[in-house]
């Protein structure tokens, strides 16, 4: 069964296949089911980009979308996530997309359910589809991963985006650096090396900024926000020192004038809205992989 839970479960070949399908969709290829197929979106945390991106992807593929509301469901009566998924499975749903506040919520589910789980983000743990759309954006820009230098900057400790990207990009041959306030370093993430931001600015090919996750911080940590942009954000002055041909990325939502100067969000280097566009194509590819009997499947040569 083609769950998509973490980037660690995907080989280089599987990543390449997903990216190739996503590129095909980006180039106008159509793939649409002619049989009624239900997919459920279960979002237990707030989301704009991921939720709507999945829904657009599902509808482009001709899938019938069930949007689950935890507040209006039997979760409020104590129903477990397992029972919710089994209920959806029993009434004919063929796959579930889940975002949940619990790290690795899927560990207790993946071997017990009979339909694919597509992880749309688990707590501070993993965000595989965000990683895949980031990979697609980088590949479109540079045509490769091998030898690229990539800085992941900001709230590394709380970021599922940092974990997924650092692991996958290292696997694909890129060199990863982190820049972060001391309070937000993640010493358990061994896929990169910490360096001062101002050393990285003129060196890296990709400046990947992370959202400051106010909802996961205590009061003490929130106090440093006043100085964050000056010390740890991408200011206009820092952008001017970036190397020629380098790009700016951010998973969004963006805290303007915190992680990045507002005037840089749509500057020439920025690929922030391109990432959002690519999210639809990647999620179409991931759904195709999860539902091969409905949407078909194809194999591609390794192109990383």
Curated annotation (Swiss-Prot):
One of its GO terms (cellular component) is cytosol. Its EC number is 2.1.3.2. Keywords: Pyrimidine biosynthesis, Transferase. Carbamoyl phosphate binds at residues 49-50, 99, 127, 130, 252-253. It is an enzyme of class 2 (transferase). L-aspartate binds at residues 77, 160, 211. GO terms for molecular function: amino acid binding; aspartate carbamoyltransferase activity. It catalyses: carbamoyl phosphate + L-aspartate = N-carbamoyl-L-aspartate + phosphate + H(+). Pathway: Pyrimidine metabolism; UMP biosynthesis via de novo pathway; (S)-dihydroorotate from bicarbonate: step 2/3. Gene3D superfamilies: Aspartate/ornithine carbamoyltransferase. It comes from the Bacteria. PROSITE patterns: CARBAMOYLTRANSFERASE. InterPro entries: Asp/Orn_carbamoyltranf_P-bd, Asp/Orn_carbamoylTrfase, Asp/Orn_carbamoylTrfase_sf, Asp_carbamoyltransf, Asp_carbamoyltransf_Asp/Orn-bd. Pfam families: OTCace, OTCace_N. One of its GO terms (biological process) is 'de novo' pyrimidine nucleobase biosynthetic process. Catalyzes the condensation of carbamoyl phosphate and aspartate to form carbamoyl aspartate and inorganic phosphate, the committed step in the de novo pyrimidine nucleotide biosynthesis pathway. Belongs to the aspartate/ornithine carbamoyltransferase superfamily. ATCase family. PANTHER family: ASPARTATE CARBAMOYLTRANSFERASE, ORNITHINE CARBAMOYLTRANSFERASE, MITOCHONDRIAL. Heterododecamer (2C3:3R2) of six catalytic PyrB chains organized as two trimers (C3), and six regulatory PyrI chains organized as three dimers (R2). This is Aspartate carbamoyltransferase catalytic subunit. The lineage of its organism: Bacteria, Bacillati, Bacillota, Bacilli, Bacillales. The gene is pyrB.
